Every structure is written in structure tokens, then in C-alpha cells.
Amino acid sequence: MNKKPTRNKKPVDQRSKINIKSYLKEVQVGVKDGVFIYTDPLSIDQFAKKVNQPVAKIIKHFFSKGINTINLNTILSLEQIGELCLDLGLDFKIEKSVTSENLLDNIEFKDKKEDLVKRPPIVTVMGHVDHGKTSLLDAIRSTNVTSNEAGGITQHIGAYQVKKNDELITFIDTPGHEAFTEMRARGANLTDIVVLVVAGDDGIKPQTEEAIDHAKNANVPIIVFVNKMDKSGANFDRVIQQISKYDLSPEEYGGDTIFVQGSAIKKEGINELLDAILTLAEINEYKANPNADPYGIVIESKLEPGLGPQATVIIKRGTLKVGDYICIGAAYGKVRIMQDENGNNLTEATPSRPVKISGLDAIPQAGEKFLGLATEKEVKELSDSYKLKQQKQKHLSLQESHEKRTRINTNGIKCVDLIIKSDVQGSLEAIKYAISNINIEGVTTNIIRASTGVISETDIKLAQASNSTVISFNLGVSKQIRDLANSDNVQILSYEIIYKMVEDLEKIMKGELDPVYEESVIGQAVVRVLWKHSKIGTIAGSYVTSGKVVKNALCRVLRDDVIIYKSKIASLKSKTTFVDKVEHNKECGIVVENYNDIKEDDIIEVYEIVKKRVY
């Protein structure tokens, strides 16, 4: 009897599947069961509407505490919302709203601790041009892609892995640190560790400072590799001294930064550097769940003739396999080809592994996240939602973009972040001094970085990532840089006179302030006689001594020049007719909302809250 041929069974996919609906969370902002629930920072106006309270009541809460620089557009801090809620007898709770439009940027995986395993650290090498970044990466990779950094451009997939002591390390291999900032501007926190390359014979240079600014702004730990120590004139101690002003010092100098000295060309110090990276990785315990559908970040992308859109991605969670359906922002597709940095075909990739993939319907952008799902239908729907989000974002005005440059610092004060570029160091110091002497209540400045030389693409990318304004002094700005700034919604201000820059900066700072509101008295009336009404309470027969009394206006009751109650004019009558206002030297009947203990000779003062000019 002939046996029927058996087919090879498709292996069972053991990865835990992502159920999109379980990660979506629509949050209704408002009061529920005595708890005020919100998702994002709220202005006073928004908060008042959500808790069904008049804006004036919220503003008066701050006025009573001596805080006058607030208005209906003021963004409330967490502490202020809590304080207001307690004042209103409410508890409060902040929750995150996750929709299909923002899922890729906000998904929080519910991995169990026992499912997490150690993953390789992801490292970016940064530093000044010609200080040896590419040579160091080549030395680590044990190849020689280029011997002249100034003319050489990295040609492989943008990342690779090396093994040291049976431990893997992933290096992001880019021509500079622009990609690092580009990804950060998109909210992609990919890098675990930055290796800062400094030439021992050259010391700290402008791009070294830029790299430090980028790393610190991203809150990423730094390892300093002092390169070219084989050259005459190389001085390790001088580099340590120069870099100490950036709060980067070795343990022997009282700091906690790891310093390694060596020579990339001679492959000296490489093992020590890799050991330092693994030590830092062990301290920080980088982990991920490999037994799940894939999630990761794009580091490079391009259109490859014959293969279509390609993307180099690094897996952050789960395992990516050939045949997986993935969504990368507005792009989606099925992974048809997956290769490592050497062009070898792979069938799967685990956390921290960099791979190049093909099979997408469009070219994604660096910094975009990808997510693997069970079906093509699911990834297409998610991609369509993301496209809708992009269309909405295109309608944001430049004014809205500018408003985002204002942030609240740790002291609750509004802060305008600046990047300053000047022709010479003397001008730079004068500008920094002039800015430090600007004193405007309720708003301050923070210099993200200040350096000499023309504005570069890196400056624009840092400004975009940190929501900063760029100030240019005695420098020309190329059309290329202006176009880039416009596309990234970065504001560049150019000056030749310092006092003019200070004047404009003061106006900007005042413009960043929320309009200040103050109380303005409309009129006063003295109570002469009282009537009691069974339905509406006490009616105060009054005489308007100044200004006018207006229905629904805010008011306060004064007795012996002391404010005893604040409310509003609930009802206003002239003789037998209900009216909206009563002028000076007229008699009227007044009902103060929710207040019946008014007495003869009390003063009813009517006022409004008006905007005050700040300059």
C-alpha cells in the first residue's frame, strides 16, 4: 500500500499577538464619580468648562493667592490642577488617550517581568568631523570602509552588531549625528549609549559641543573615547579638563563618566571601549520581550531600483520574521526580504538587531515606529489612520507651531529656549550677557547652545527637537538653511546690533506670556433698604454711587471696607422693570447670587476681569 506524501507543516508561531483594540484607550475628560480625569495639560478655560465652573472663579482662586500673571489661556501644571480639584472637592487623575492615529507613538506593552530578557545595548558614535568617528566604527567592525573621514560616507545599512565576550553590541553607523537628532525630533528614543569621540591632539571643537548638547538633551549616558593618542601633541589630561565644563568627568575627578583613550587607526583601546559599553549596559539592564509580534524604529530608508522602498530598522521588542505584515507610519506591507549588514538573507531578527527589509508600499521616514500585526487588513487600517493624522497635522498653523516653543520649566515659569550663533566669540559672550540681564516677570530664557560659525543643518535639527528659536548675529543665512528652517517650522532671527536683538527678544518673551488679566471696577451701589422674597431671596434696594451696575457681572459685597462675599449680580430691577444695567445716580433693586445676609449700608461693588497690556 502506497503512503500518501506528507506536506511539511508550517511551524506554529509562538509569538504573542498584538490585539490593537486592547491597547486603544479613549479617555473622556471630565468629572466622573467625584474624580476629575484628563489626558493632556489644560488651559484655565478648558479646565473650567470640564468641571462646569465659571472661568472667573478659577482665576479668582489664583488672585487670592497673589498670583496675578494668569488668564483663561494659562496652561495649568499638575500641581495647580490638583490644587484646584481639592478646592472644588474633587480628586484628580491623569490618563493617556490612545487611538489608532497615535498608537505607534504611544503603545505601552504589557510584558510580564519573566518574559523580559537581556538585549544588546544600542550605541551611537558622535563627535567633531575628522576626529575619527568612521575610523573608530571601522576598527570596531574590523573592516576599513574608508581611511579618509572627510571624504568617506558610510555605505552599508546604517547599523551593525559586534560580539565581545559572547555579548552583542549594536552600533548605529551614520555619517554624523543628524540622524540621531532627526529621530529624536520624531520622538524616537532609540539610542541607549552615546560614544563621544574626541581627538587627543585637537581637543573640544564645535561639533563636539553639538554632540554633547544632543546627547544631554536626549538624556542618554555618554562614554568619552579620546582618540588619536598615538599622535604627537595628544594630551589626555587636557581633554578631561576641557570637557569637565560640560559636567563630564571621570571617577578619579569626582564624576561618573567613563573615559577611554586609544587610537582607532592602530586599533588601540577598542577592547577597553567595548568593555566600558558592556559595563554601562549591565548597570542599566537593557531588556525586551523577544517572544512577541515585532515593534521597532526606522533608522534609514530609500528607494532601491528593482526592489522598491527599503527600510533599515532596529527591533525594540518581539521578533521580526520574513512574511510578517507591518505598519510603519503611513507605509505598510509584507516583509519579503530581510538582510543583515553584510547582505546575508535572514528569516528573523530579535531585539536590538538591525536589518534591511523590503516589501513596503511607500518609503517611511527615519524615526518612525513600526508594528507587526497578524493580517494585511490590520496593518492597512492602521496605516490609513496614520495618514489621517498626518493630514490633520498639515493644517496646524505656524502660529500653533510657534506656541509650542514655549515650555514650563521646573519652577513653573514659562521658558523660551534659544540657540545662538555668532560671528566671533566676543560677540557671543556679549549676547549671552545681554540676554542674562533681561528681566520679565513670568517668563525666562534658556540657551540650549551658543557657538560661533554659520547656522548648520544640525543647528536647525536641534532647534526642531528642542522647540528652540535660533538667533543669528552678524552672519548670513543660506537659502538652503532658510528653506530647511521653514519646512521644520524653526524660527531664525538675524541681527547686527545687540540692543535691537534684546528689544525683539523682550517682545518675543512678552508675547510668550499669557495675557495678564486684572480686576476693573465697573461701578458701586450702596444698600439703603432690604426686602425678603420667598423665591429669590433678599433684594437689596440700592443707589448707584458711581459707574453702573450690570446684570450677571461679577460683584463683591463690602462691609466697613472689608470684602465679605464674592458672587455676581443675579437679578437687576429698575422700579418695576427687570433691566440689564442701571447707571450712576439711579436707584435699583439688586439680587446677589447665593447671598441673603446682605445688610443696609453695605457696598455692592461691580467689576470685570480685563486683559492688561504687558508692553
Curated annotation (Swiss-Prot):
Could you tell me which Pfam families the record lists for this protein? Answer: EF-G_D2, GTP_EFTU, IF-2, IF2_N
Compartment(s) where it occurs, according to its Swiss-Prot or TrEMBL record: Cytoplasm
Ranges for the region named G3 are 173-176
Give start and end of each tr-type G domain: 118-285
| GO CC annotation terms, alphabetical | cytosol
- MF terms in GO: GTP binding; GTPase activity; translation initiation factor activity
Q: Where is this region: G5?
A: 263-265
Protein family membership: Belongs to the TRAFAC class translation factor GTPase superfamily. Classic translation factor GTPase family. IF-2 subfamily.
Biological function: One of the essential components for the initiation of protein synthesis. Protects formylmethionyl-tRNA from spontaneous hydrolysis and promotes its binding to the 30S ribosomal subunits. Also involved in the hydrolysis of GTP during the formation of the 70S ribosomal complex.
Protein name in UniProt: Translation initiation factor IF-2
